[in-house]
Design a protein with these regions (language model features):
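Mg2+-dependent phosphoryl-transfer enzymes with acidic/Ser/Thr/Gly-rich catalytic loops
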Residues: 1-6, 45-47, 54-139
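Alpha-helical substrate-recognition element adjacent to the catalytic core
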Residues: 1-55, 139
Length: 139
């Protein structure tokens, strides 16, 4: 099954990495193009085929030197619930399953693959004063 990808999400991901945010992708899917795209955007922690997302997230946070109460996590389906409940800020795209929408702190107005990651990263960077830059937001 092919996943859709947003160029705006991609821009925000690479911009966040350039601004020093630590990003990770933990997916139950095994689609290598997801890994290639994320690595191409600068994400170093890309984990596919993750059956236990909370375990992966905990390991990644440890490697990054942060605790789960410093993590924002976006998920859209039942396998994300434990991870969503363990972090500081839980969010989901508006087309997530009802159980996830009910469990999160923030339902992002965009659908998955249509700018929801951009919205989260843009808000996080604006809060830190990192969204505007003299670099002109270059790729």
């Amino acid at each position: 099954m092919a996943r859709s990808a947003s160029a705006r999400d991609g821009f925000a991901v690479q911009w966040a990495v350039k601004q020093g945010l630590q990003l990770a992708v933990v997916s139950g899917g095994k689609e290598e193009p997801v890994k290639w795209r994320m690595e191409g955007l600068g994400v170093k922690e890309v984990h596919l085929g993750a059956a236990d997302k909370l375990a992966h997230l905990t390991t990644i946070a440890g490697r990054m030197g942060i605790s789960l109460d410093q993590v924002a996590y976006m998920g859209d389906d039942l396998p994300d619930l434990l991870a969503l409940k363990a972090v500081c800020l839980s969010c989901c795209p508006h087309d997530a399953v009802p159980e996830v929408r009910e469990a999160v702190d923030w339902v992002v107005p965009e659908a998955g693959g249509q700018g929801c990651v951009r919205n989260l990263l843009e808000q996080a960077m604006k809060l830190r004063g990192l969204w505007s830059s003299n670099d002109g937001h270059r790729w």
